[in-house]
């Protein structure tokens, strides 16, 4: 049985760090208020010359280097982003060009904060279907450029960055002991589209628009949706929360992260948390967290890792993989 195994990983962050203290000078807020409600202490903000594509390229190159591969070895690039450099062409095609690739395919996926989970699921499907041997999956965002910097309820939450993994086809035994993606569960419900959205677009306002969010409504749904889709992954693979070595959640808010882990019975010692350093980087948050935990040695070969995310739409999903 063919499995999609993580062969390499990488990350990239903008040069500029914006602390909560600096945020105090922009809007009516405080470090104490932000930390207490979100767990965020700082975030990275893209500067001149730093774009979604440039950050994505840097993360991709880091992942390729760690995998011992070159762009020539990649068959497909999937970029999860809600903040593309252009309406078209796709950011993935831009990154393909930056990497010097003249073969294969490249496209973007947009599922907001769930984007990386959706992209990994799609890359896994290409590999299992025999359409690709190696897939470069990137989550890259510059959310700072769609924020309303006068809205203290949203501008304090988000940051910029990119992360990437290389998925490679490897033969497995077809058991839960295999390395690679074991199952993926995706969900969406468009009835909640007005809870987290951008108030602009090419066919409506002709503007980029700004992010708008009903935070309490998002929080109200988040824990239940996340735990349901993780439990679906357990059922599909015959695993339980006790089998999980690491939960790598979308880094939206520490309260959501802790609430989901508690409901699932996963101790916080097994949860990778980077929201304090990065803020909410949407589709980039999971690969950034993976990179941090794999680089410092927490996530090791053979570990059972659960990825989960929820984003605007609503969209949500989980991927269970063995590292």
From Swiss-Prot:
Active site (catalytic residues): 113, 250, 280
Catalyzed chemical reaction(s): malonyl-[ACP] + acetyl-CoA + H(+) = 3-oxobutanoyl-[ACP] + CO2 + CoA
Any GO CC annotation of this UniProt entry: cytoplasm
Keyword NAD in annotation: no
Keywords per UniProt: Acyltransferase, Cytoplasm, Fatty acid biosynthesis, Fatty acid metabolism, Lipid biosynthesis, Lipid metabolism, Multifunctional enzyme, Transferase
Gene Ontology MF terms in the entry: 3-oxoacyl-[acyl-carrier-protein] synthase activity; beta-ketoacyl-acyl-carrier-protein synthase III activity
Annotated pathway: Lipid metabolism; fatty acid biosynthesis
Primary location group: cytoplasm
Compartments in which it is found: Cytoplasm
Region (ACP-binding): 251-255
UniProt keyword Acyltransferase present: yes
Enzyme class, broadest EC rank: transferase
Record-linked InterPro entries: ACP_syn_III_C, ACP_syn_III_N, FabH, Thiolase-like
GO process terms (BP): fatty acid biosynthetic process
E.C. designation(s): 2.3.1.180
Assembly description: Homodimer.
Family, per entry: Belongs to the thiolase-like superfamily. FabH family.
HAMAP family on file: FabH
Function: Catalyzes the condensation reaction of fatty acid synthesis by the addition to an acyl acceptor of two carbons from malonyl-ACP. Catalyzes the first condensation reaction which initiates fatty acid synthesis and may therefore play a role in governing the total rate of fatty acid production. Possesses both acetoacetyl-ACP synthase and acetyl transacylase activities. Its substrate specificity determines the biosynthesis of branched-chain and/or straight-chain of fatty acids.
Entry remark concerning the domains of this protein: The last Arg residue of the ACP-binding site is essential for the weak association between ACP/AcpP and FabH.
Protein name per the record: Beta-ketoacyl-[acyl-carrier-protein] synthase III
Source organism: Sinorhizobium medicae (strain WSM419) (Ensifer medicae)
